[in-house]
Amino acid sequence: MSKLILIPTPIGNLDDITLRAIECIKDVDLILCEDTRRSLKLMNHLVIKKPLKSFHKFNEHSTVEKIIFEIQSGIKVGLISDAGTPSISDPGYLIVKMCIDNNIDVECLPGPTALIPALVISGLPSDRFTFCLLYTSPSPRDLRK
């Protein structure tokens, strides 16, 4: 059955991947990934061979329609990010939206995201919070301005 599955990957330790994520990786026909080199390390660690296709912020707009067509043709596609849950400050929103618009099933596995552990150990109240953006350190060039 054709579908898109968002598969969270470990943040840091490759052994932190869930059994369900491993089974989904084995089950899909194609894996979309931010960086094929980094994803290949995970695949080698898991001893799984699957076709990997680069899908990142620089090419998602130019490749998403072709991927939607592939899913509609009957394949099952997994989307992984370099670390954590796809679409949380990573590529994913566009393909999920297009799958929904095209009546393609989308599944998201539970798994690691840096957001919740950061909140839990912050000492801040965790019953209500807002996540607005991913903070990145300024580049040296930005600091010179």
Label for each model-derived stretch:
Residues 1-58:
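Glycine-rich, flexible N-terminal cofactor/catalytic loop recognition
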Residues 3-7, 73-81, 129:
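Generic beta-sheet signal
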Residues 9-13, 114, 139:
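Amphipathic alpha-helical repeat scaffolds
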Residues 37-39, 85, 114:
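Alpha-helix capping/helix-boundary segments
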Residues 59-66:
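Glycine-rich, highly charged phosphate/nucleotide-binding loops
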Residues 68-106:
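Glycine/small-residue-rich loop that forms an oxyanion/phosphate-binding "nest" at active or ligand-binding sites
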Residues 94-137:
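Class I SAM-dependent methyltransferase SAM-binding "motif I" and its flanking Rossmann-like core
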Residues 135-145:
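Single conserved hydrophobic/aromatic residue that forms the stacking wall/gate
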